[in-house]
């Protein structure tokens, strides 16, 4: 992948054109909420981490309200490895026993979240970290995974949850006070247990509840790819169903695309899957005309 251009080497007239191109998008999204699922290489490479932090701050400064939901799979895997555990996945979901849940809470709600918050604040933003347990944000219930080999049967994958309800009051309060919420996808159940929830699913549900104008999901590939490796730039619900059926969409992309499609069907006006390995990909998607990643449509 080529390095991003040095802005100091760009001609002043071109810089002006870039800024002018952003104006209609700033107007369109001014005062609106944009939910960003932050994950993949963008969370682990220092250059990309810093670029993301600056992007989010810029969005806030021009009147757009970013809400970040982060993952942390590689960091969880690394922490599990240190205690001699191997991560196991079924249909893109992490099997989470009690010991793994303790690691997930520590890594997501501590190390990863605070790294994001610290970096945003370092560059002049005002970020606040939350888990879904804070302020009663995410009510969860145990997820029972359908067994594809045995119709009607379910697989118990431990303390893995699905979103039962979202109470957005704490997020809205932070937005009203000009803070940037950074949310770890950990919910609480009526049984008193903590639940590990797929970050893509949380981002999609949160976008709907917050009446977000846009949902952006960052990943480590250019977008949704066909079996030949060609980027699919625009997908309807019918096309997505076909890609599920023939196995083109599989593994970790299953919950991501399902969540994106559900959000589009539930009223989120613009839903995109983008390549987080590209520096400033969030700004490119939101504030320019450049086609980027895969757009998910409800029809």
UniProtKB/Swiss-Prot annotation:
It is found in: Cytoplasm. InterPro entries: AceGlu_kinase-like_sf (IPR036393), AcgluKinase_fam (IPR004662), ArgB (IPR037528), Asp/Glu/Uridylate_kinase (IPR001048), NAGK-C (IPR041727). The record marks 37, 256 as: Transition state stabilizer. The keyword DNA-binding does not apply. GO terms for biological process: arginine biosynthetic process via ornithine; L-arginine biosynthetic process. It is an enzyme of class 2 (transferase). Keywords: Amino-acid biosynthesis, Arginine biosynthesis, ATP-binding, Cytoplasm, Kinase, Nucleotide-binding, Transferase. The keyword Secreted does not apply. GO terms for cellular component: cytoplasm. Pathway: Amino-acid biosynthesis; L-arginine biosynthesis; N(2)-acetyl-L-ornithine from L-glutamate: step 2/4. One of its GO terms (molecular function) is ATP binding. It catalyses: N-acetyl-L-glutamate + ATP = N-acetyl-L-glutamyl 5-phosphate + ADP. Its EC number is 2.7.2.8. Substrate binds at residues 72-73, 94, 196. Catalyzes the ATP-dependent phosphorylation of N-acetyl-L-glutamate. PANTHER family: N-ACETYLGLUTAMATE SYNTHASE, N-ACETYLGLUTAMATE SYNTHASE, MITOCHONDRIAL. Belongs to the acetylglutamate kinase family. ArgB subfamily. This is Acetylglutamate kinase. It comes from Paraburkholderia phymatum (strain DSM 17167 / CIP 108236 / LMG 21445 / STM815).
